[in-house]
Amino acid sequence: MAPQFKRPELFGFDKSHAQSFVQGKWISSPNNKTFEVDNPATGEIIGKVADVSVEETKKAISAANEAFKTYKNFTHVQRSQLLERWAELIMENKDDLVKMLTLENGKPLSQAEMEVTTCSGYLKWYAAEAVRTFGDVAPSSLQSQNFLISIKQPVGVSALITPWNFPAAMIARKGGAALAAGCTAIFLPAFRTPYVCLGLVRLAQEAGFPDGVLNVITSSDASAHGKELTTNPIVRKVSFTGSTNVGKILMGQSASTIKKVSMELGGNAPFIVFPDFPIDQAVESFCTIKFNSCGQVCVCPNRVYVHKNVYDEFVSKLTEKVKTIKVGDGFDSSSAVGPLISQDGCKKVSKHIEDAVSKGAKITVGGKEISSSKGYFFEPTVLSGVTQDMLVASEETFGPLASVFKFDDTEEVIEWANDSDVGLAGYVFTNNLSTMIHVAKELEVGLVGANIEMVDEPFISFGGIKQSGFGKEAGRLGVQEFMVVKEINLKTL
């Protein structure tokens, strides 16, 4: 049964199809072209969404540019107040947003509620940061009567390209930073999950943001719109969350106009367990982060490295824990793991399992797609006897697969953990403070969870290194990504 919404108009259900949002108006494609969005838990069609052309993206860029001329001069307090109001409206409409997030993404309601609440948290953080975008003043080293003044200004029109795995949180994490800095924005949400973005932006409109400050382009052809956003000289900033391969394409396109770019790309997170840490606690922490959003999280552990002295115990307890995990529709309150986003996701998990088993790994639980379901469900799976020559060591699975490696000593596991082209998150579990600090420092990642699975909250500056990208979101550095520094040499009379 489809969920009932208190305000169906938030998602365009009051019309024949949901629309894009440009210059304060909800628009359809000129030829009324649409694309369908399905529920990954059932395969059923949720509805139709406007499939607009690149011409609409050009109009959105023009609208954002015109709005920037006014919005950049809003005071820090005005921007802060607008963000606070947006955050309040999100919480007032939380139930509808949570239902839509579960409907189009598939994650359980409890996880969807956490994500929507996090949206509000990001915006409240940025509301506070909006009034803290200070510059600096220093005396000149050459002329005693001179002052060197650094001021921070918004970079300009920003393209914000968001993913399907956290389609609500990324709107707030990127959009809140841009708006706090004084930028205007064009959102390009993933075609699999456009509805929650449309709902959030409608609430931003109700919060009082002027026409043109926020725009949304909906399309089934992200590459065409992405190319326009990255090559149009009016756009001065591109922020993208998604795969490393797509990130490379967008970076190359952005180079044509030398834009400021932030990239939050793929991960291959190591999860390292030393023998002095309580195994039950390590298993609990691992499952909390690994099976969140069915493993479709860029910071979730992809490689589990367990010391040889506790390896068998860890695998045994992890296997028993995974056997208890309920897989099902996100609207079922007993479900802990929902579906993958598409059939392609199921195929990749199967590919990694088949490769590992062919090279000697053993399945201790799970291992199969749940074929009795109409959705894209896969059994939570544990592999033991995993080695560095298997695909799971070098490729991000992005699914409910726990691949457990055995290591002998600290330097060996650090070498294995760093044997990756990407470096977003890593985890280390040990009660030895020296070991913890050493491993945390040596891991080639941008985020480390030390005895904790949490590496993402509004106060943390989120981002990776290597081919996981660059730039920071949230935290003290998030707003700075949308600002430029101007130096003024002032001579007093």
Curated annotation (Swiss-Prot):
InterPro entries: Ald_DH/histidinol_DH (IPR016161), Ald_DH_C (IPR016163), Ald_DH_CS_CYS (IPR016160), Ald_DH_CS_GLU (IPR029510), Ald_DH_N (IPR016162), Aldehyde_DH_dom (IPR015590), Aldehyde_DH_Superfamily (IPR050740), Succ_semiAld_DH (IPR010102). Pathway: Amino-acid degradation; 4-aminobutanoate degradation. Its EC number is 1.2.1.16. It catalyses: succinate semialdehyde + NAD(+) + H2O = succinate + NADH + 2 H(+); succinate semialdehyde + NADP(+) + H2O = succinate + NADPH + 2 H(+). GO terms for cellular component: cytosol; mitochondrion. Keywords: Cytoplasm, NADP, Oxidoreductase. It comes from the Eukaryota. Homotetramer. Belongs to the aldehyde dehydrogenase family. This is Succinate-semialdehyde dehydrogenase [NADP(+)] 2. It comes from Schizosaccharomyces pombe (strain 972 / ATCC 24843). The lineage of its organism: Eukaryota, Fungi, Dikarya, Ascomycota, Taphrinomycotina.
